[in-house]
């Protein structure tokens, strides 16, 4: 039984060329005998909420992606710098929300979930903001030889290793399922012009594109990177089904992310 990925993950081409198999351990699971596990997915940003924490239960790998919601949980997020805690109310089954605050860059946040006599926690530190200067476009040839138009994210990586990024594309208002992640291990302090190779939906001139850029912490990056490895989208694939890395304690799957956010909207040219 594993957390079936809701997204198809694509690591940026510049990162793919430099990767070596990670040493981090992932848990190999018996798909027939593993018990159901809590699945927690939540994010806060530097933009005022509302924010949502989604809590569900894992299902057998062979079943459809219909995750049973977890109701009646107590959910809080605490700013570890100023000590303020924020409660999340259950708006619908398994969906917990608040609009009480905006995250502060460089602050550490702790998520606590109490459900069915079990406590789950996660810690995420919100990085400083990196400005997405512009989005341009480049013609490329895909792995299957098809010509495609890709967005290029242009931004200045701050000096100092340990900067991690995630990008999400919306084309004509529709979110593209690919999630792109990037780290600055080989490009520290440089001006980045990163093409977002997208094999699930091709940009066309005249489309409306919204590109979101998130500055994420290492644990968030490792979650999506390990998910890419497990699903084979990074050029490496787990020998047997496994769960992606998580920053959650208590035996839960998923992730909690505190990140900064900015976006660019434009017409594809």
What are these regions (language model features)?
Residues 2-10:
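Bacterial N-terminal signal peptides that target proteins for export
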Residues 24-269:
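A sequence/structural signal for flexible, mid-protein segments enriched
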């Amino acid at each position: 039984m594993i957390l079936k990925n809701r997204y198809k993950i694509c690591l940026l081409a510049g990162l793919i060329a430099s990767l070596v198999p990670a040493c981090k351990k992932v848990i190999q699971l018996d798909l027939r005998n593993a018990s159901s596990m809590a699945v927690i997915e939540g994010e806060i940003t530097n933009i005022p909420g509302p924010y949502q924490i989604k809590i569900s239960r894992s299902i057998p790998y062979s079943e459809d992606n219909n995750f049973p919601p977890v109701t009646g949980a107590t959910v809080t997020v605490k700013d570890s710098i100023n000590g303020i805690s924020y409660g999340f109310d259950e708006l619908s089954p398994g969906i917990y929300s608040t609009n009480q605050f905006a995250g502060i860059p460089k602050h550490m946040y702790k998520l606590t979930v109490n459900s069915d006599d079990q406590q789950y926690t996660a810690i995420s530190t919100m990085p400083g903001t990196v400005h997405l200067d512009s989005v341009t476009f480049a013609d490329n040839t895909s792995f299957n030889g098809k010509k495609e138009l890709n967005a290029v994210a242009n931004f200045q990586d701050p000096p100092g290793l340990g900067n991690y990024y995630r990008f999400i594309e919306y084309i004509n208002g529709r979110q593209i399922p690919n999630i792109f992640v990037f780290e600055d291990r080989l490009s520290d302090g440089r001006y980045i012009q990163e093409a977002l190779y997208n094999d699930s939906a091709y940009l066309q001139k005249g489309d409306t594109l919204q590109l979101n850029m998130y500055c994420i912490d290492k644990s968030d990056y490792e979650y999506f990177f390990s998910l890419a490895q497990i699903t084979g989208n990074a050029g490496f694939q787990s020998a047997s089904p496994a769960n992606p890395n998580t920053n959650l304690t208590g035996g839960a799957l998923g992730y909690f992310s505190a990140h900064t956010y900015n976006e660019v909207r434009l017409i594809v040219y």
